[in-house]
Amino acid sequence: MLYFSLQRKVNCIPGEISSLENRHTAKKWGGKMKKLSAIPLVISLLFINYSSLTLAAESPPDASSLGLENLTNDLSRQELFVKILESDPSRDKEFDSFAVKKYFKFPADVAYDSVLNQPRPSSLFGVDISHHNGRNFPIELLAKNKSVFLYMKSSQGTRYVDPEFAGFWPRAGDTERGIKLHRGAYHFLSSGTPADDAELWGRKQAMTFVKVIKANGGLRATDMPPAVDVEWDVDSLTGKDRWQKRKPAEIITMIKAFTAQVEADLGRKPVIYIARAWWKDAVGGENSFAQVAEHKLWLADYSNQAQASETPRSINQTKWAIWQFTDAAQLNLGSSKKFDASIYKGPTAEFYSTLGVQEF
């Protein structure tokens, strides 16, 4: 714009020259014009270089650059539960059909307790997503709709990365656009095969998880603690849980190996996402949960009983930090997509101290 304004001013000078002074002025402007004419080229080159650098900096790492593969055939949480019930209908009673609170909506139900018919005290809510929720999941609307935190699936096993994590992660952390959302990453722990050493397999998965996190900028003090998702590792063909091929002691060893490696590499103690029904099914006695109880518990319980009383059934009466209570939450406005929702029950200050998260 500056270039064209000056050019217009200079071009009008020759027609107005009637004196030596004006000719001198024209010569003076003409000299400046040669210098000014180079400005657009310089600006263009600077813009191109800056754009290239910006794009290079903002381009998320793809799976192949990390030596990994994109997840394509993993089951969503809803599909996992369906497969489990198909393989063993008797579990329907234990799960209470995993009835979900389908009417829970952000932000209306965040502020008001429909069970007690009163404003909801001391409760903070969060969301977790994966590529199953779609690339265009409205992350930017979550904080405005009273979601305090967002967990995103990053990886699974030793070979796979969630194809949307590299896009989700920076969007959730875009504080320059006013997004104040405590973001977190979780890894889906794979059982592997009985031939895989449990401790080594756990550590290898941790290294995959850490690799993905670091490649995407690492953790901030305002981020949620890293999480490991330990649940049904369903074979999509048979509907059977692959963990059934593991001994209870191996499962515990793998969890401990994973969490120890992650804590050593990222400097944050992971939380463990787990369902009581799965623990009883795969590991057995609830007393054994004491071996991993040093970690904060992110408990999954979708049962009618838990939702009615807002008191989930924990494992070995362990105090839970976060409770995932539905996979069918929605936003009141802006999107009709369903997603998983969790709650932290307690004062805001306690939320930060309990989970080791820094306030914005």
PLM feature spans:
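Bacterial N-terminal signal peptides that target proteins for export
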Residues: 32-39
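Sec/Tat signal peptide C-region and signal peptidase I cleavage site
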Residues: 52-56
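Short, Lys/Arg-enriched N-terminal segments with co-localized hydrophobic residues
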Residues: 12-32
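Substrate-binding cleft of extracellular glycoside hydrolase catalytic domains
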Residues: 109-141, 145-257, 264
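Catalytic domains of cell-wall/extracellular-matrix polysaccharide-remodeling enzymes
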Residues: 222-311
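Functionally critical loop-and-helix segments that line ligand-binding/catalytic clefts
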Residues: 57-129, 137, 288-360
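N-terminal amphipathic/hydrophobic targeting modules at extreme N-termini
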Residues: 4-9
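Bacterial N-terminal signal peptides
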Residues: 40-49
